[in-house]
């Protein structure tokens, strides 16, 4: 078996990626999220496939088909809620994965980091389109509001919006194409994940110390496969607890009302995992400015390798930078809360202050702190 594992052209690739992969001996549980995201992606593709077998992408029957899945299909309710809450799980894991990358300076592996940003954008696009498919009130109005943002693009904006809609409003054509994109994007994500891993295995993994670990590596299997299984159990337990006890905890009650173009919901808001970006979008009174801030809130991640001015890679031994990162985390929690609140005083002001401090922390305070720490350490 060993011979085949190391000689067979296809099995050899799997062997070098998951079995004999030289891995730093000191990586912590923070390095489990990559494998958890892989499992989550597989689960989303499988549950999505089974949902697609019963779903109809037509404005007149989409809502009813989702109801039919929940009521009449064997374990349809389970598949539907696993898929919906699996998306929430996916984003929790992604945000933790990115947070770990920032804390331990993994963004210095710039190719892996940039592919990761592309992955984040692809996952966000997929989740947004998936939210439109049940054709509830929030699906319809969410699609209308978010696609309408493109009209802020000078000159070509309005034409672009109508082109995406496939008409003069969000309708059957929009739903059909969103379903098509929602189906194809996960497979593009799988290809990007493979590229992400390819670049990662070119350089080798980072580790909590931020130092070169070439002199102290161990095989991935059995040490980290066992460790990953523990992560799978934790994730599986959390997800099942959510699905079986409170499946609608993270959803919006408005989405249990069929889409009605003549009736606007009192508060249009996206799913919880987009609320921080939505709060940044809303905190700028100008439409184009808001759209640019929305994009910047995600694309600012691409600047991390450039803004890294510290002589140390990791934040493990940099207490001031460490505090700043936790302040940034708290700031994101505040933005998430504000994104779900109505546009009125004092929420508008809190949102604007949180948006300013978000960009200020990343673009100004973190690089300055890095330079200051270098001075303290006489580097």
Swiss-Prot record:
Binding, heme b b562: 83, 182
Annotated GO CC locations: mitochondrial inner membrane; respiratory chain complex III
UniProt-annotated binding residues for a ubiquinone: 201
Main location as per UniProt: mitochondrion
InterPro entries: Cyt_b/b6_C, Cyt_b/b6_C_sf, Cyt_b/b6_N, Cytb/b6-like_sf, Cytochrome_b, Cytochrome_b_C_euk/bac, Cytochrome_b_N_euk/bac, Di-haem_cyt_TM
Free-text remark on how the cofactor is bound: Binds 2 heme b groups non-covalently.
Protein's UniProt keywords contain Iron: yes
Bilayer topology term: Multi-pass membrane protein
GO biological process: mitochondrial electron transport, ubiquinol to cytochrome c
Subcellular location as annotated: Mitochondrion inner membrane
Any GO MF annotation of the entry: ubiquinol-cytochrome-c reductase activity
Alphabetical keyword list: Electron transport, Heme, Iron, Membrane, Metal-binding, Mitochondrion, Mitochondrion inner membrane, Respiratory chain, Transmembrane, Transmembrane helix, Transport, Ubiquinone
Lineage top rank: taxon: Eukaryota
Positions with a binding annotation for heme b b566: 97, 196
Needed cofactors: heme b
Record function comment: Component of the ubiquinol-cytochrome c reductase complex (complex III or cytochrome b-c1 complex) that is part of the mitochondrial respiratory chain. The b-c1 complex mediates electron transfer from ubiquinol to cytochrome c. Contributes to the generation of a proton gradient across the mitochondrial membrane that is then used for ATP synthesis.
Quaternary structure, from the entry: The cytochrome bc1 complex contains 11 subunits: 3 respiratory subunits (MT-CYB, CYC1 and UQCRFS1), 2 core proteins (UQCRC1 and UQCRC2) and 6 low-molecular weight proteins (UQCRH/QCR6, UQCRB/QCR7, UQCRQ/QCR8, UQCR10/QCR9, UQCR11/QCR10 and a cleavage product of UQCRFS1). This cytochrome bc1 complex then forms a dimer.
Family, similarity comment: Belongs to the cytochrome b family.
Further comment: Heme 1 (or BL or b562) is low-potential and absorbs at about 562 nm, and heme 2 (or BH or b566) is high-potential and absorbs at about 566 nm.
Name this polypeptide is given: Cytochrome b
Source species of the chain: Myoprocta pratti (Green acouchi)
């Amino acid at each position: 078996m060993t011979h085949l594992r190391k000689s067979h052209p296809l099995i050899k690739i799997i062997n070098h990626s998951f079995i004999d992969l030289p891995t730093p001996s000191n990586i912590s549980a923070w390095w489990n999220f990559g494998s958890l995201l892989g499992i989550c992606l597989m689960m989303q593709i499988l549950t999505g496939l089974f949902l697609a077998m019963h779903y109809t992408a037509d404005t007149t029957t989409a809502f009813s088909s989702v109801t039919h899945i929940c009521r009449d299909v064997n374990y349809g309710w389970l598949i539907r809620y696993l898929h919906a809450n699996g998306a929430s799980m996916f984003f929790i894991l992604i945000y933790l994965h990115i947070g770990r990358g920032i804390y331990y300076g993994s963004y210095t592996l710039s190719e892996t980091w940039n592919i990761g940003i592309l992955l984040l954008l692809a996952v966000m696009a997929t989740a947004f389109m998936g939210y439109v498919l049940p054709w509830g009130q929030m699906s319809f109005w969410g699609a209308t509001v978010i696609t309408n943002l493109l009209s802020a693009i000078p000159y070509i904006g309005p034409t672009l919006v109508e082109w995406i809609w496939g008409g003069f409003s969000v309708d059957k054509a929009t739903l059909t194409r969103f379903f098509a994109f929602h189906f194809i994007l996960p497979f593009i994500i799988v290809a990007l994940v493979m590229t992400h891993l390819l670049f990662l295995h070119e350089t080798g993994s980072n580790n909590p110390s931020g130092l070169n670990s070439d002199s102290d590596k161990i095989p991935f299997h059995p040490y980290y496969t066992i460790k990953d299984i523990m992560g799978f159990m934790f994730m599986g337990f959390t997800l099942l607890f959510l699905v079986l006890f409170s499946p609608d905890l993270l959803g919006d009650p408005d989405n249990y009302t069929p889409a009605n173009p003549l009736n606007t919901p009192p508060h249009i808001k996206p799913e919880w995992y987009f609320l921080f970006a939505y709060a940044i979008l809303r905190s700028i009174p100008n439409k184009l400015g808001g759209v640019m801030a929305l994009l910047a809130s995600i694309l600012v991640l691409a600047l991390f390798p450039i803004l890294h001015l510290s002589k140390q890679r990791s934040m493990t031994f940099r207490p001031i930078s460490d505090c700043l990162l936790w302040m940034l985390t708290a700031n994101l929690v505040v933005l998430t809360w504000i994104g779900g609140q109505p546009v009125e005083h004092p929420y508008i002001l809190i949102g604007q202050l949180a948006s300013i401090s978000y960009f200020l922390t990343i673009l100004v305070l973190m690089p300055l702190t890095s330079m200051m720490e270098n001075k303290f350490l006489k580097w």
